[in-house]
Amino acid sequence: MRVDADDFARPCSCGREHQIAVKEILIEAGAVEKLEEEMSEGMLREYISPLVICDTNTYAATEELMEDIYDRCQVLILDAEGLQADRHAIKIVENNMEEDIDLILAVGAGTIHDISRYIAHNYKVPFISVPTAASGDGFVTTVAAMTLDGVKKTVPSVAPICVYADTDIFSKAPQRLTAAGISDLMAKYICLADWKIANLVTGEYFCRETVKLEEKALKTVKSSIQDITEGEEDECEQLMYALILSGLAMQMIGNSRPASCAEHQVTHLWDMEVINGPLDALHGEKVSVAAFLVLEEYKRIAAAITQGRCHAKPYENEDEELLKETFGKKGLLEEIRKENEPELLETISPQHLEKCLNGIEEIIDELPSEQTMFHLLEKAGCAKTVYDIGLDESAVLPSLRLAPYTRRRLSLLRISKMLDIRGE
């Protein structure tokens, strides 16, 4: 399957002309053979000092199929155990890569891609994506999810110039990784609802075409969950296609707004380990659990609006002491304060928000029910409850209360700080 990126780079009904940096996207068996051809005699032959960034697991998974490619590259194999996209990993790459690299090949999943695109951006060299698992939607984005100074941040980076997703590689990835990819897509229900609500309440820029792209990705996966979990190659290709569509949506907008909001803010909080210890869970697993928690909270808000028990109130910073207690103990308080300046809610009047409540309810009503979402996640083998990722119920309320502060992006979870819900 060849995806024509030019289809997404055109004037849009939102008033913008979306820019797409990726030149070629190939999702099929034998895709890495095409990559080798391009490096030998095609459009990539001009690069004479390529660097492969992979880890011990992804190298083992690709060594045989990519032997000819590895022979022509500097290959940097990072230890997969405990690997994170952070300053430590960046330093390892910088200390070991040759000075004259002119191309980076990211051979791996989300963490390897974040490290690679961050390095590519800093050193102003292009990079190529070789996904080894359909585990997330970050392969073609222009941002990197990095842990910097203890805080999970989305930082400007670069998109790959080409993607070579070889079905012979990613369809054989552990089922846990594939389930994480499904989880990442199922969570789009939440972030799309948040984007619609932010547009309704504040007039924030909104692109319907990009939303349609994310919804297409969701539909593609929902209809094939059973076959994907059974490792059917054609359906695994559809999952990879859906994940790349989601990444293209982010590339079109220039940030992660179409694919990340309240549900990812919850996972960022967990990643910071200020209310919990280290979690032995994949990113997608944490995202699906967070999405389910947020869905339950949003349905609670919608029910209160329907029953006339929810009304807008003026914004007051009621969390200052909790922020000091939670983030201060790890020296992150000033970073969190800086992230949240100026306060998003100070621009919203309670009178205007009150008028928006029915519209908010309608947007929430479009979301799947808790039962439907639980069934979808269960069918795909995804994590569903806090217990699945090593947390317990005591983490739920602080997670929902503190998560909005991890990223200055408007969500209903943040807006709920201006809602007075009675009768519970």
What residue ranges belong to the model's regions?
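Non-transmembrane, aqueous-exposed alpha-helical and coiled segments at domain scale
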Residues: 84-98, 134, 260-274
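A glycine/threonine-rich phosphate-anchoring loop and its flanking beta-alpha core
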Residues: 23, 122-220
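Active-site segments that bind and position negatively charged phosphate/pyrophosphate groups
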Residues: 212-358, 362-363, 368-372
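Solvent-exposed alpha-helices and their adjacent loops that cap or buttress functional pockets
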Residues: 17-19, 44-45, 96-99, 120, ...
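A short, small-residue-rich loop immediately preceding and capping a beta-strand
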Residues: 99-119, 123-133
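Short beta-strand/turn micro-motifs composed of small residues
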Residues: 53-54, 108, 165
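C-terminal charged capping/lid subdomain of soluble metabolic enzymes
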Residues: 1-16, 185, 301-424
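ATP/NTP phosphate-donor binding region
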Residues: 1-103
